[in-house]
Amino acid sequence: MMRNLAQQVGLFVCRISSGTSAWNSVISASYFSAGITRYSRSTVYRGYKAWQNLLDSEKRRWQRACAKYQGLVTSLEKRLCDMHQSYSTGDEKGMIIYEDYIYFQDNGCICRYKPNTGEDSLEVLLISEDLGLGDYEIQKIRVSPKQKFMAVTLKGYEREESTCVVVKLDNGPQVTHCIENVFSCEWATDRMLLHTSQVNVQCRQVFATDFSDANGAAQLVYTENDPRFFVDLYCTRDKRFITINSNSKSTSEVRLIDNRCPFEPPVLVQKRIAGVIYYIEHSNGCLYMLRRHGEAAEYKILKAAVSSGMKHWEPVYEVQERTKLVDMEMLKDHCLLFLKNHNQLSLEVIGLPSGAVLQSIKLPAWACALELDHQAEYGAGTVGFSLSSPVHPPVHFEYSLRKKQLSVDTNHSSDGIHQFHTLRLEAKSKDGTSVPLTLLYKDSEKQMRQRPLLIHVYGAYGMDLNMSFKVEKRMLVEEGWLLAYCHVRGGGELGCNWHSEGVLDKKLNGLEDLGSCISHLHGLGYSQPHYSAVEAASAGGVLAGALCNSAPRLFRAVVLEAPFLDVLNTMMNVSLPLTIEEQEEWGNPLSDEKYHRYIKSYCPYQNITPQNYPCVRITAYENDQRVPIQGLLGYITRLRKAARDYCHESGTSESRIPHIYLDVHPGGSHCDSLSWEESLRKVATQLAFLHMELKLDIPRRCKGSTQ
């Protein structure tokens, strides 16, 4: 099954990752290594001491500035905490059903029990605090076929790489091994674990550790030599094969390890062909390939016998043009496809091996995000999933293959579904392309033009905007805010071609789309520039930062999280571990003057100029390997100088100089270096900044605590 990908800004909630499809396993790896992976490099060349002094200066500046927000931050933080508790969905999403046991995570502990015997069978298998690893979150859990061993990956807030802890389960749980720098792992047999090695945010090697060997020594299984490729592992839904997936932005290659004979060398499915991306599943003796070939092509499902070349693959199903394949669940005799067309989610059930469409179901119009349940049984007759939106908490649904019926779980809250409006709009971009956008709001006595508007954008790597439920978004809409999600080119909301139209020398399409979406909303009477703000994270910072340069009067404030703001210098520095990999998204300015000129034309850092900028707040992480702090220090310094220069040149009062802040947190991960409590305060601070800079009234539920 696939997992939706983005936790870019909202509150962090730790959940176990229990199993993914080949489709999502590889997409997640690509996204992890590049989709939200951004490097920045300042052109302000300084020695270590100089930039450390600049960093210390920025920290002091922010400490002085944040004093004026403190009362509002405290009250917002309390309200967010209360709302989070009231909308908590419990631990059921972290549960893994494995034969007669249910595994679950609770406050850093992993436990299991037999549902038929109740609490008497409860076992505590692992307590993360007892490992002495510091503040770690549980990332993934993998149980061996006969439940002799359990592998758990844990990730600390201070580093990108995870630690894999192996627990022996029979005769009482016991930690036997810790394997450092692991990105993904899968059990081939009850005692053989395959795992990838992550070094400098790259995965290039696969190892196998045999725990029947007293030494538990790791043996090298596969090495990827092309720096454009990222390696990930996935176990097919029927547990027959482990796939070794090597993927660049545009090309794939998959090898199979047969779990019945795991010591045999991996078997190549199809040699890599430039422009061909594919993923592999297995069912009833057939391999199923999810494949796309070419920039404009959408995904197709094909089938063949094991070890057949590309010419022997037979078509089974094809995704329609301008349709996004959101998720996929492969079962024994069926495949469930979750699709998005015109921003509307739907479910299609196809029979295997024929590929005939057995049923098509439109999902509720309010739904913006989908998450499949963890690892349904391969031969199960039902598939569960949750639907949500930024303002609607998850609602659980089940599809019955036997009844051919979709049902909603009445035990899950549907609170607020009818309180809020979900409006699907389209804006005409500069070249006439229709760009979809989603507007969320609640009825209010206040006129639409006087209400604050928060605009969201990403527009890179073919990834959708994250539109899952977040309590801070719910709170804003309850207070009368409008939330706009601009599905610009470069993202994936309209399928693979939508990404192709916003990549390489078409990146400016995404910028034009964003400006057109905001202007369209204002033209329809939804808010106005004085009450509008933009929010973006990571690669979304490219478009948000570029729009600050090209159309700063469209909005009053911008909040950025670990943003990518210096595309040109990043892509010219091949010593950075991901620069070569990123060339398929941004181009190579070192070898092609065309790309050098083109990137320079939109790069946020390169195009800062004296003008009246919006207020800016950037959240950064001191040891972030993906967006090094030096680059953001250079950006902030140049932006602040440009704002001051404009003030002096235009004779504007210094009181009108926009507030430009860099809030630096300790930690070494990208966008998620904080504990839950720290994330709560970060979000509250971002909201307080927006309220103050847009000159809004204090939220009515916060007035008492700020006086």
From Swiss-Prot:
Signal peptide stretch: none
Listed SUPFAM superfamilies: alpha/beta-Hydrolases, Peptidase/esterase 'gauge' domain
Compartmental location: Cytoplasm, Cytosol
Active-site residues (renumbered): S538 (charge relay system), D624 (charge relay system), H670 (charge relay system)
Entries under InterPro entries matching the protein: AB_hydrolase_fold, Pept_S9A_N, Peptidase_S9_cat, Peptidase_S9A, Serine_Peptidase_S9A
Entry's Gene Ontology cellular component terms: cytoskeleton; cytosol; Golgi apparatus
Quaternary structure and interacting proteins, as annotated: Homodimer.
Function: Serine peptidase whose precise substrate specificity remains unclear. Does not cleave peptides after a arginine or lysine residue. Regulates trans-Golgi network morphology and sorting by regulating the membrane binding of the AP-1 complex. May play a role in the regulation of synaptic vesicle exocytosis.
UniProt protein name: Prolyl endopeptidase-like
Gene of this entry: prepl
